[in-house]
Each structure stands twice: as C-alpha cells, then as structure tokens.
Amino acid sequence: QTKIDNLVRHIDHVRNNCLLLGERLIGLKNPIGRMLIANGFIHDNSKFYGIEWEHLTDPSGDPALTKLAIHHHNVSNPHHPEYWGTIDQMPQLYLCEAVCDWAARASEFGTSLQHWIDVGAAEKFDYKINSEIYCKIMYFSGLLLDKPFKPL
C-alpha cells in the first residue's frame, strides 16, 4: 500500500470511531458529541503537509527528521497529550478524539487497546491506573467499544 492509502485508511478509522462515540455521547445529552464528530472530519490533516508528509512514514529516511516530524505532529494537534503539556490538561473533547485514535491504531496494528491504555499510554503519559484521567479514558473507551458477547 502507498503512503496515501495508509494515511487515508487511518483517518477513516478514526473518523468512524469519532462518529460512533460522538453519536453515543449525543444520546447521553453530552454536547461534545457533535464537536467530536466534526473533529473526526479534520483528524490528522497536518499529516498531508510539510515535514509530516515528508518524514512521518518514510522508513528509509533520516531518523532525526522522522523524530522531528513526530514531535511536530504531537505538539501541533490537540488530540495528543503533548499539545497540552500533560494528559491531565486535555479537555474531554480531545481526550475522546485520542481514544478514537488509539482504538484505530490498535485495530490497524492488531494490538490491544486495553493494554495500550493500561501499560503503554500510562507509562508514556505518566498516569496511574484508577487515576482521574484513567477513569475518564476508560469511560470513553467503554462508550466507544461494543460490549463482548455473554457466554451461552
């Protein structure tokens, strides 16, 4: 697949997650649902331009430029905790978008969203299980994900 195919596929996954979570939030009378749906339509647009386009997905490229492109993306997009300085400062709207992004990535890579929340993100963004931010993340991921089938 080409770089553009992978990027568009990821954005489609995130947009679909934002639509689903947004509709569920609207059903709960939460006004951020509509804004989350809107964000799904502009998610990761910065990846189409400049250093992000040139260096985010080029495995043969200069690692220093790839690192710079990742940093640029993270501090330029409010669905990344780095934009806010800390995950604890993220408004709920962008925390919801982050959860939608994480769920898309987990699906694309065949990994566990729950493991990312409990281990990967907890370590990267320095939060503890059962902290206030963890509980918010779990609430939004619980709204996004369908419940598993009950055993017969």
List the predicted regions and their residue ranges.
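Metal-dependent phosphohydrolase cores
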Residues: 1-152
